[in-house]
Amino acid sequence: MKKLIILGSTGSIGRQTLDVVRSLKEEFEIVGLTGYNNVSLLSKQIKEFRPKVVAVKDEEKARKLRENLDEPIEVLTGKEGLKEIVKYEADMVVVAVEGIAGLIPTVEAIKLGKNIALANKEVLVTAGEIVMGLVKEKKIEFLPVDSEHSAILQCLKGNNKREVSNLILTASGGPFRGKKKKDLVNVTVEEALKHPNWKMGKKITIDSATLMNKGFEVIEARWLFDMPLDKIKVVIHPQSIIHSMVEYVDGSVIAQLSVPDMRIAIQYALNYPDRKYVEGVKFLDFYALGQLTFEEPDFETFKCLSLAYHAAECGGTMTAVLNAADEVAVSLFLQNKINFLEIAEIIEEALENHKNIQNPTLDDIISVDLETRERIMRKYLR
């Protein structure tokens, strides 16, 4: 039985990971779970999966959690709790916690030699060089949970990486595919949250609407697969059936296809290199599929994608600024404090005003993250 710790078990990916575990209960044992605010859902998860230890946001949430439980359990709190929980004996840590909060526990888990299933974008976007350096040093398995990166991993398997011509990440184009800037000035939060194919959390859904999500995935792919940026392409594929492709030097393209269901990518990371069927996952019906279509991304309208490429080319702490500025800008948009197009404007301004630090330490990255957030919030929440 493989022992798992799931960071962020009450979020979208965390819940789907537990779906996979529920379907494959003979394969996995849950050692630890963490939830931020959702004490009631975490209580239910504890009763079902019976972990040894859990972690929550603060002491107040810990008290509420203990009140909800019949049996005593070790409850850790705060940022220290996230660092502490990965020290428990486990074969794999699933990093499904949102935001920069996922960085330190991931680094701690790698240092302890634990395999990682990564569903957090910020870890590689902000600190890819440091993290992948540790992965190589510790010789652990570091497996992507993102459907696009999982697809690339599968398309590379059994092939010579030196023969890769391009990694091709697919993007649905989000709810505003085909629109121009003038059409996007007055879009509402509700419209931006209507993703055509995937059910996800609010932050990642807005990032999909701006194409920043794809920009983050380009940066992640660079570090995960040790590939130069000019060999990582993005193509709009509205049906979200092809999850990504690898083009080889002979002109062959290998693609991974499936229905849009995150549990397929999750099970692959948890069972790697094996595959297991997860109850409820549908198979593709090629007769009913109809057309698969492809378009070039509109870098002018969806400027976040080009900002991500720019930050990645600059390196250093620029990607930490990109990430922090995006997180604050999306939060402001969700609160109706700014319009949709201002998300990219805020990020661009933050990048222009930043004095880049090359070869940053983790402390540099965390302090740049904090400074960027504070600067933007001071300006927009006066």
From Swiss-Prot:
Positions of Mn(2+) binding: D146, E148, E217
Gene Ontology biological-process annotations: isopentenyl diphosphate biosynthetic process, methylerythritol 4-phosphate pathway involved in terpenoid biosynthetic process
Listed GO MF terms: 1-deoxy-D-xylulose-5-phosphate reductoisomerase activity; manganese ion binding; NADPH binding
Keywords per UniProt: Isoprene biosynthesis, Manganese, Metal-binding, NADP, Oxidoreductase
Binding site for NADPH: T10, G11, S12, I13, N38, N120, E122, G201
Tree of life domain: Bacteria
Cofactor(s) this protein cannot do without: Mg(2+); Mn(2+)
Cited Gene3D superfamilies: 1.10.1740.10, NAD(P)-binding Rossmann-like Domain
Annotated residues for binding of 1-deoxy-D-xylulose 5-phosphate: K121, S147, E148, S172, H195, S208, N213, K214, E217
Disulfide-bonded cysteines: none
Keyword Metal-binding: yes
Record-linked Pfam families: DXP_redisom_C, DXP_reductoisom, DXPR_C
Catalytically driven reaction(s): 2-C-methyl-D-erythritol 4-phosphate + NADP(+) = 1-deoxy-D-xylulose 5-phosphate + NADPH + H(+)
Pathway given in the UniProt record: Isoprenoid biosynthesis; isopentenyl diphosphate biosynthesis via DXP pathway; isopentenyl diphosphate from 1-deoxy-D-xylulose 5-phosphate: step 1/6
Enzyme Commission number(s) of this protein: 1.1.1.267
HAMAP family, per the entry: DXP_reductoisom (MF_00183)
Function, as annotated: Catalyzes the NADPH-dependent rearrangement and reduction of 1-deoxy-D-xylulose-5-phosphate (DXP) to 2-C-methyl-D-erythritol 4-phosphate (MEP).
Family membership noted in the UniProt record: Belongs to the DXR family.
Name this protein carries in UniProt: 1-deoxy-D-xylulose 5-phosphate reductoisomerase
